[in-house]
């Protein structure tokens, strides 16, 4: 749907978002087995980077496997990874943090030395939480109003499902901001941290990585900041009219992941 200004030979690795690129909820987007067979024939390295921190890395590896995609844990990161990267820089000795989030975020923090507690919390960390309660929001609000740092996983206000767009992490953050007047420090995309981690693990330069995502203001913006090539797919939260307005324009705009791969292999 857009002029392709990159070639198959210039790309060494694909960095893929998941929600809206690989699947919507529990439904695969297209024939993922065929897509990844084509990726394998092209000999591209593959990495997965999602802003969704609800699952652990182990759970994401297992989920990918159910769709016929085989990945190792080093190939997968989420915004919880970026949160712990930031926390280690700010609080190298670890400590208590109050978490509004799900298992993926809580476990990642614990593994990094930050345990979930409101007592003496050095930070409030919030992300997507499908079990959010008034009590959780109240505690987070009181801590932030008392001067505790507010950190958000990612600003995505919606999340693509087969039923349509539903509230995402950004909606939780917005509620806390409304009650405190404090904007969170965002750790995940569009901050480039997740992509920097991916490039380090892949051992490649930014210009040799193609980032494929469905949300321009996070997936594409973060990649563009550090010089990665970008492909915006219309299988998630963005339609063609919205895609056409995004500046700077992605290198590729396509209907879905399969279309991106087909454009590249036909070059």
Regions found by a protein language model. Name each.
Residues 2-18, 23-44, 53-77, 84-267:
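Asp-based, Mg2+/Mn2+-dependent phosphohydrolase catalytic module
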């Amino acid at each position: 749907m857009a002029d392709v200004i990159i070639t198959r030979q210039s790309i060494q690795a694909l960095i893929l978002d998941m929600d809206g690129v690989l699947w919507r909820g529990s439904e695969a987007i297209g024939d993922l087995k065929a897509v990844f067979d084509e990726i394998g024939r092209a000999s591209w390295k593959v990495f997965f980077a999602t802003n969704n921190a609800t699952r652990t890395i182990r759970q994401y590896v297992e989920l990918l496997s159910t769709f016929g995609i085989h990945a190792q844990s080093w190939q997968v990161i989420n915004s919880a990874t970026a949160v712990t990267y930031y926390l280690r820089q700010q609080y190298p000795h670890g400590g208590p943090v109050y978490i509004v989030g799900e298992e993926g975020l809580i476990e990642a923090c614990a593994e990094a030395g930050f345990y979930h507690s409101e007592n003496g919390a050095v930070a409030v960390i919030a992300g997507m939480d499908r079990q959010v309660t008034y009590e959780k929001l109240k505690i987070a609000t009181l801590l932030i109003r008392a001067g505790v740092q507010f950190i958000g996983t990612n600003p995505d206000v919606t999340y693509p499902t087969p039923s349509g767009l539903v509230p995402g992490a950004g909606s939780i953050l917005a509620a806390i901001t409304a009650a405190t007047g404090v904007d969170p420090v965002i750790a995940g995309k569009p901050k480039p941290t997740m992509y920097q981690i991916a490039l380090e693990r892949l051992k490649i330069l930014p210009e040799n990585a193609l980032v494929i995502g469905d949300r321009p203001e996070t997936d594409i913006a973060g990649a563009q900041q550090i010089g990665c090539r970008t492909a915006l797919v219309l299988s998630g939260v963005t339609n063609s009219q919205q895609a056409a307005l995004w500046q700077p324009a992605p290198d590729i705009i396509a209907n879905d992941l399969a279309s991106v791969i087909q454009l590249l292999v036909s070059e």
